[in-house]
Amino acid sequence: MNAQTQASKNALHKSLERRHNASTSLAALWRPALLQAFVKLDPRQLLRSPVMLVVELTAVLTTLLCFVPDQAVPTSVALQIALWLWFTVLFANFAEALAEGRGKARADSLKAGSQGLSANKRRADGSFESVVASSLRKGDVVRVQAGEMIPGDGEVIEGVAAVNEAAITGESAPVIRESGGDRSAVTGNTQVVSDWLLVRIGANPGESTLDRMIALVEGAKRQKTPNEVALDILLIGLTLIFLLVVVTLKPFALFAGGNLPLVFLVALLVTLIPTTIGGLLSAIGIAGMDRLVRLNVIAKSGRAVEAAGDVHVLLLDKTGTITFGNRRCSALYAAPGVSGKELAEGALLASLADDTPEGKSIVEYLRILHPIEEPRREELTPIAFSAETRLSGVDWNGQVYRKGAVDAALRFIDLPREKMPEVLSREVDKIAQSGGTPLLVVANGRLLGAIHLKDVVKPGIRERFAELRRLGIRTVMVTGDNPLTAAAIAAEAGVDDVIAEATPEKKLARIRQEQGEGRLVAMCGDGANDAPALAQADVGMAMNDGTQAAREAANLVDLDSDPTKLLDVVQVGKELLVTRGALTTFSIANDVAKYFAILPALFVGIYPQLDVLNVMRLQSPQSAILSAIVFNALIIVALIPLALRGVRVQAADASQLLQRNLLIYGVGGLVAPFLGIKAIDLLLTAVGLA
């Protein structure tokens, strides 16, 4: 074993070990998150969160005011207000650092496996030279032998090999990668465990799957999504409005012959602006991306995840998504005048050279239920399946055995469909109507009978589609099956619509039709022919084991190559949007409640008429403002777990979700400040801090 092979194996081992040991529990991340909370006090970092930048500026101002004598505000009270303003900023920074910490633990383990990799790059003269993997550019060709690591994302242009993708997918079983077809794409930092591959690099440094995955989980470097930018604008607008409100209070107080200390006005501003959502907004987005990474899905941008939350239509391939995809032989039906033994012998011979899962299932079925003497494989002349003939079988001892699609088999023996025996025709129709696939068996110009291949619908898929329907999402099954078979499986699975005998052009046309009617569309695919539809869809998820063209066209890549993951991505997207909306509602409701709770307590001495609004009966203006500041800081801490976990989206339509969230987070946001501020006021008064 050469040095490069040994180094590659060591790198893979260390990567897996670190990935396994990387602790992402909250308890293990608290200390580094606390340290990062102080680092993030740098105003340059807070520029991404305008609301919290305002809070930090008020904390600085209040701290300075502590050194300015003011008979209206005891120094001890001013100092407490300053401390709690700093705590407010630190708590918000802590929430963001905690969300980032979970992603960074994963990023560190991913980075560890990619360090120190080398590659055998092909020169112009056809020879190979050893270079550092990070120097490779798009279009370079490298040779990867058994035991070596694939240095970057690319396309197999020559060779067939087993590849261990555990460093990326976590799945230890090797997968086959070969040139041509839909299994030609390879991912950097995976290991060839047998044979060799010639790979054309498809991504420049910093653009590979691994690089995108690391960038995704390192939340601090991510770009804000359009929804986050829009929400930032709203929060800035509310901050300016409340700033104007607070500024006008000073003249009102002076006009009435009273006075409001500057410390109180600064603190009042912080209690009124939307600090709750302002402090948690970044953590919500980072935690949402982290949930996506835990699903082993990487996104090229946050836009795709947000779009997934707003999707109206899901286009899902039948095979592998709705059904298991491994059709199995479940029954044989003999034509009139043909014995069961003759049909079994013909079906077995027509399937002996068929290495597809369907062909193997027919052989297994017949060996168990209809055992017959089999000829040796070398005596057979195999006839492979082709898209033109849609038949496969063997020639043996001058005899011809074929099996295939109904129309293809009938055409092979020159038998019109209307002359097909009625009893067998009825059985074929029953198979198709039940969702199965009928194959006809013919031998030497005779029709022997039919084979029933059954495709099993995945358990629980009907219930998942029902949940999506209650969320207002329509599901469309895409299949190459005939309309009868497609309709039967669609009815069993519970999808809303079906595209039978689908082609890439049909998929693309359906996506454009839905988008033309104002709906967002999501789909998944893996082949080069899926690339146009993946690029057109609002959310396109490519399989990691698919072609490079599909992965480049999509805005999401599933490293596990599981098409059903699209349903989970939609769930994550909805949770992200609902969490952001719920906490925004809670924060704004908080501000409204605090406005009516605190202002009467501050002004009752200046305007006695406001006593009727002073429902909380706070002990004094000092205790009122201090209680509000303490509540304002502590509510951020209380909501950190919800921001990181996300609001669970239950199966309900949009109006029900809105009513539920308005009740919980809207009404809750109005009530919580009254209860919380009153409780803190009593506590501060009892211990003599106000």
From Swiss-Prot:
Q: What is its EC number?
A: 7.2.2.6
Primary localization class, coarse? membrane
Q: Which residues does the annotation say bind ATP? A: 354, 358, 385-392, 403
Per the Swiss-Prot or TrEMBL record, the active site comprises 317
Pfam families assigned to the protein according to its UniProt record, in alphabetical order: E1-E2_ATPase (PF00122), Hydrolase (PF00702)
According to its UniProt entry, the protein's GO biological process terms are: potassium ion transmembrane transport
Which membrane topology term applies here? Answer: Multi-pass membrane protein
List residues traversing the bilayer: 49-69, 72-92, 229-249, 253-273, 596-616, 624-644, 662-682
Q: Which UniProt keywords apply?
A: ATP-binding, Cell inner membrane, Cell membrane, Ion transport, Magnesium, Membrane, Metal-binding, Nucleotide-binding, Phosphoprotein, Potassium, Potassium transport, Translocase, Transmembrane, Transmembrane helix, Transport
Cellular localisation: Cell inner membrane
What family does the Swiss-Prot or TrEMBL record give for this protein?
A: Belongs to the cation transport ATPase (P-type) (TC 3.A.3) family. Type IA subfamily.
Put simply, this protein is called: Potassium-transporting ATPase ATP-binding subunit
- Species for this entry: Pseudomonas aeruginosa (strain ATCC 15692 / DSM 22644 / CIP 104116 / JCM 14847 / LMG 12228 / 1C / PRS 101 / PAO1)
- This protein's encoding gene: kdpB
